[in-house]
Amino acid sequence: IVPNPRPMAEVTYAEIRELSYMGASVLHDEAMAPVREVGIPVNIRNTNEPEHPGTRIVAELSPEVIQSTQIAGVAGKSNFAMITIGKHLMNREVGFVYRLLGVLEHNDIPFEHCPSAIDSVSVVLESRWLEGRVDGLLDEIRRTLEPDELEYVPSIALIAIVGEEMARTPGIAAKVFSALATAGVNVRLINQGASELNIIVGVAPDDYAPALRAIYNAFIG
C-alpha cells in the first residue's frame, strides 16, 4: 500500500504488539511475550541485507528516537463489521453495555472495539465471526436491549496509529484527521484508550489504502 516504507530503527514491545495485531506481520503479537517479560531486546534484520542495522525492539525508546519521530508506525486491517445500537437515555440504563456484551458472549463472538456516545454504543467485530449469523445476532440484540435504532455495517476497515510518545506530543490527533480530510476520507469510527498508545480510525473499505497512505505521509513519508 505504501511504496518503499521507511524502516523503523527502534520500537517498544508495546508498540510492536499493537502494530502486529493490526496487520504488521513481521512478528506475531504473542511472540513478544517471553522476551518482554525478562526485558531482552530483539533485533529484526533482513536476511538479504544482513549488514543493515534493522529494527530493535526494546523496553524503552532511546532519546535519539524520541526526538526524531512522533509515532512508531501505522498498520491496519479491512476485515471488520460494526453494529451500532442507539437508545434514548442509554446512559441512565444500568448494565446496558454489560447486556450487549452478554449477547456476544452467548454467541461466542469476541469484539475488537466498543466506542460509545451518550445514547449509542458500537461494537466492532471481525467479519469472520458473523458469517451466516448476522440476522440471528441482531434479533437477539433487539430482544435483549430494545434499542430505538440498530445499524449493521457489514464492512469497515480499521487503521491504527501507534506510538508511546503520542501521549506527550500535542497535535497528533489533529495531524491524523487533517491528513484524512485532505485526502477526502470520511471517518466512520474513532477510538483511543486512556493510555494514548494508539488511535484507531475506521473508514470505508474503498478508503482504506488512501487513508493509510495519507496518515503515513503526514508523519513518516
Language-model regions: role of each:
Residues 1-221:
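C-terminal catalytic "cap/lid" subdomain
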